[in-house]
Amino acid sequence: MDVFSRTFLPAASEAGLAVQTATRHMPVFRRCVGSGDATILVTRCSRPDRPMSGDYLLLLTHRRLVVTRQTPVLHRLRLHLNAELRELSHVTWSPDPRLHSVELAATAIDGIRERFLVRTQFPKQVWQLDALLNHAFRTRVRSALPRVVATVAETPTAVRPATLHPAVAR
């Protein structure tokens, strides 16, 4: 059993998802997530701007954010969002313990702003969700470019003058 399989079902049961729901969405998630990627969060969510568009299931791993949608009438599964965390920009979330919810927003690589509302049962779960999102988006995502740290008072290293040597033409 791979890492994704070992971590997905416990995360789904922790979120209170029925086993049927988790196993129904599993093939879609399996196509998007690598076998070595551990699940951080699985939860139901909705779209605040489209409340009647169906049920959504959000999967957050250390590398990807995947959201599936179940259509309201025929209950078909559709992939709504599949993005690496480093491809997402302007990621924000706002926890609201009074409403027992966290609103997550991110701009996908195609420029479309996605907003999801995650509801919890208790206010304490709002702060747990906030900590998970903070861990995933602030501490795990690093830029690929190395950081260059220098101070203004630092003197540059001695630069050797370029010496030119004549080339022998034959």
Region spans (language model):
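Anionic N-terminal interaction surfaces
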Residues: 1-59
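Conserved beta-hairpin
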Residues: 49-75
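Generic preference for well-ordered secondary structure
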Residues: 13, 17, 23-25, 49, ...
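Acidic, Ser/Thr- and proline-rich intrinsically disordered linker/docking segments
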Residues: 3, 7, 74-170
